[in-house]
């Protein structure tokens, strides 16, 4: 921040709020109308848009590149405007992979090659691959030490399995909310959500899921592959989130199709 101040000749007096007291402090600021000039924070502040300045004209005058970027995108206008039709807040515009994709499935291509298997494209093929990883010693060490599929229970962050709901017609997110046919929908109220859980429960019962997946901490997950070439499918922004021995052995699993072709 010091370098930014020197480059712009603008000094900023920062007010740091501990995460534990963030919500209370922000609520007091808005309720007493004692706001700083600008706030970097969570989206829930946007509900107080009437207390925030209108940015539309200022953006056009002082931020033409930002304005042009917004106008070039179909997805930004809906997110930008408050209920009064004005812009009061700005998104971060951070399109790093971890902000575009909550989590990706990565499969051990070397294991596929060792067993003469093709990349799975459907949930049935995916299950058959996991069974082969469990039963056919894909790492070739003569031991039943393979973990067909590992992830961690940290909903909405890397290492999780939200994308396995897609083949059942549900776009699962950390907030459990998605848009369906133009309407905001609660994912856990969809039949496809329960169908997905039932299918995944079957994988767990057959020993195709890592038995410790739901209790792994971030550090434990990061060292899951430390024992050697023992991981078949992992979840994360990158395969090395699970501590795989050789990340170059892993390839992204394509969007899987459900039994009726749903993706």
What are these regions (language model features)?
Residues 1-263:
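Extracytoplasmic/secretory soluble proteins
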